[in-house]
Regions:
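Acidic/histidine-rich catalytic cores and adjacent linkers
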Residues: 5-9, 14, 22-184
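A generic structural motif
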Residues: 1-2
């Protein structure tokens, strides 16, 4: 889920930067509306107040006559809507409808960054669909892998494999140990 939303946010950022360069032949500056609203573009729609949403929308509409930045933002929100299907139990009909709506938006826009995003989602759709249907992620595994790498990095090369394995198990079970200590 996180990685897909990050891909959507990265596409919005790439479109914003490219459009700014096309409009001004330079990077964005503080007074440029698309640069000033860059954080709002990355924020979820439900986390924007009506006032900040209206400001973002109107400022960008006034400057970007091609509408590419807002098209990218809408595509990102469509992707988030598709991923939110997991909250309603992964209804297959609703999932197919939202996937079609997302892919159609990206393809109809003919924006290169959105075409790349749509291609990535289409390529990884079987894996994404299994997440939407089941709601199961590999987030816990990735978290444990991060802990193992961190322990190895801090350990500066253990000489004893048993001590290395013991330290990794110690760090990976910290939450469970804290829960059992307080319940006794």
């Amino acid at each position: 889920h996180f990685h897909l939303v990050k891909l959507g946010n990265d596409a919005v950022t790439k479109v914003r930067r490219r459009v700014t360069w096309d409009l001004r032949d330079r990077r964005g500056r503080k007074l440029d509306p698309e640069w000033a609203n860059r954080r709002r573009l990355l924020r979820a729609r439900e986390r924007l107040s009506q006032k900040s949403f209206a400001k973002m929308w109107n400022d960008i509409m006034a400057e970007d006559h091609s509408g590419q930045i807002l098209s990218a933002w809408i595509a990102k929100e469509e992707l988030r809507t598709l991923l939110s299907t997991v909250r309603v139990g992964g209804d297959p009909h609703l999932t197919r409808h939202r996937l079609h709506r997302f892919l159609a938006w990206c393809i109809d826009s003919q924006i290169p960054e959105l075409l790349t995003l749509a291609g990535t989602v289409d390529t990884w759709w079987p894996e994404i669909n299994s997440f939407v249907r089941t709601g199961i992620t590999n987030g816990r595994t990735e978290g444990y892998n991060r802990l193992v790498k961190q322990v190895k990095r801090v350990g500066c090369g253990f000489r004893n494999r048993d001590n290395s394995a013991r330290r990794i198990r110690f760090h990976c079970t910290r939450k469970q140990r804290a829960a059992t200590q307080t319940s006794c």
